[in-house]
UniProtKB/Swiss-Prot annotation:
Pfam families in alphabetical order: KH-I_KHDC4-BBP, SF1-HH, zf-CCHC
Protein name: Branchpoint-bridging protein
Recorded GO MF terms: mRNA binding; zinc ion binding
SUPFAM superfamilies, A to Z: Eukaryotic type KH-domain (KH-domain type I) (SSF54791), Retrovirus zinc finger-like domains (SSF57756)
Length: 455
């Protein structure tokens, strides 16, 4: 087989893609007076590899910063990316929009952004190396910052219906305070939407600058160590994820915050757990109105007394089942009922029994004897002639005490017996006197004259 008219294709040119980290591979890397291996040939554990990588990167960043300071160059010119020309294979990332402070100076230049990023990375690595490497010595030009600042942006544009500010602050700021206590960092909400319209931003302190207000909504986290900042970022992200991914009606965080707010306001109403037995017992005690039938109109749900067609007459066939029982609210006494009245006496059969049963009227009391001075030696003749007025009539006797019919009956019977005895005795004496006088024939002697009669 011939290859006429064709030239054999040679191997493609070996041209490696250039990047900002391009360069000749080196066996050793020199950072100042120290030399580090770039190829690991020994047997190391994963922890040892991580510790060596942290130590190597810390020394590399420290070398870049010290060289830029000694040569009075920009940190951008010291980095390896400065030696690579902009080609189609490598293009620099676009710069963010410029930001200015209150004096008009730009705060987010390229040099400043790169320096802050390198210092932040070195600070985090130093913290990790100090906790994992025994007898670790920090670089000589390293100065631990007094505080570390982190901005965590909130996805308000993606989820405009969620009130991130309200949930992060919580009822009376308790949620934000709890996040600060758990993480040990200081959290502040900054950016657009952090301040209500019409209110001043002076209440947020001096850190709320014009740049922070114009920035997107974010949580400003400040702490003295990266560990606290990472913990605060984790806690804030957990709250944001709960708000985003919680289904409708299952937002337990909102329920807990509303309950906490009710406790603070004093309007909480505790709900008891559902007890099916108590609910069933309560339903049994209640009257089922579907079983109540009116006897007038025949409808269900009311009794005949409450019927609109009732003209004030109660139907005769109204059962006690349809009428609710009324409770007698009168006070009950423990006094026994009075004894029954005695039976009426039998009618008398003779006149003697009638005379025995009916007591005679009591005799009138004798008139009081008038004194000599008041009467003036009055005699019967004066009374007869009307010279001296008669004495006043006696007062009426007091009414007899109220007694029972049985006691009155017994007393009346006793009085009748005693009077019958007295009458029988007086009649016997009278009969004996009359018999004696008639036998002798002597008339009875007249009564002696009164001493008061004048001579």
């Amino acid at each position: 087989m011939s290859n006429r008219g064709r030239q054999p294709s040679g191997p493609p040119p070996s041209r490696k893609r250039e990047t900002k980290w391009s360069g000749k591979p080196k066996r050793y890397a020199n950072f100042g007076a120290q030399s580090f291996d770039t190829v690991i040939t020994g047997h190391l554990t994963q922890e040892q590899l991580d510790a060596y990588q942290r130590y190597f990167r810390i020394e590399e960043i420290s070398n870049f910063l010290s060289v830029a300071k000694q040569q009075h160059k920009s940190i951008v010119d010291v980095l390896p990316s400065a030696k690579v020309d902009e080609t189609d294979h490598y293009k620099r990332d676009p710069s963010p929009p410029p930001k200015y402070d209150k004096n008009g100076n730009r705060t987010n230049t390229r040099e400043r952004r790169v320096t802050e990023a390198l210092e932040k990375e070195r600070h985090e690595l130093v913290e990790l190396a100090a906790s994992s490497i025994k007898n670790y010595m920090i670089p000589s030009n390293y100065r631990r910052p007094s505080r570390t600042v982190e901005r965590l942006y909130v996805p308000v544009k993606d989820y405009p219906d969620i009130n991130f500010v309200g949930f992060l602050i919580g009822p009376r700021g308790n949620t934000l305070k709890k996040l600060q206590e758990d993480s040990g960092a200081r959290l502040q909400i900054r950016g657009k939407g952090s301040v209500k319209e019409g209110k001043s931003s002076d209440g947020f302190g001096s850190s709320q600058t014009g740049t922070d207000i114009q920035d997107d909504l974010h949580v400003l986290i400040t702490a003295d160590s990266p560990l606290k900042i990472s913990k605060a970022v984790k806690l804030v992200n957990e709250i944001i994820d709960k708000l985003i991914f919680s289904p409708q009606g299952m937002n337990f965080m909102k329920r807990d915050q509303l309950k906490e707010l009710a406790v603070l306001n004093g309007t909480l109403r505790e709900t008891k757990p559902f007890d099916p037995e108590a609910h069933e017992k309560k339903q049994q005690q209640q009257m089922d109105i579907t079983k109540i039938v009116c006897k007038i109109c025949g409808n269900i749900g009311h009794i005949a007394r409450d019927c609109k067609q009732n003209n004030g007459k109660r139907p005769l066939d109204d059962n006690a089942e349809n009428e609710p029982t009324t409770i007698n609210k009168k006070a009950r006494t423990d006094v026994p009922p009075p004894p029954p009245p005695p039976p009426p006496p039998a009618p008398p059969s003779s006149s003697t029994e009638i005379s025995k049963q009916v007591p005679p009227p009591p005799p009138p009391p004798p008139p009081p004897a008038p004194s000599a001075a008041a009467s003036g030696f009055a005699t019967t003749e004066n009374y007869k002639q009307g010279l001296v007025p008669p004495p006043p009539p006696p007062p009426p006797p007091p009414p007899p005490p109220v007694r029972s019919a049985l006691v009155n009956f017994e007393n009346n019977s006793k009085v009748l017996l005693t009077k019958e005895k007295e009458e029988s005795g007086s009649s016997e004496l009278k009969n004996t006197g009359e018999s004696s006088s008639s036998s002798s024939g002597v008339p009875p002697s007249p009564p002696p004259p009164s001493s008061n009669v004048p001579r």
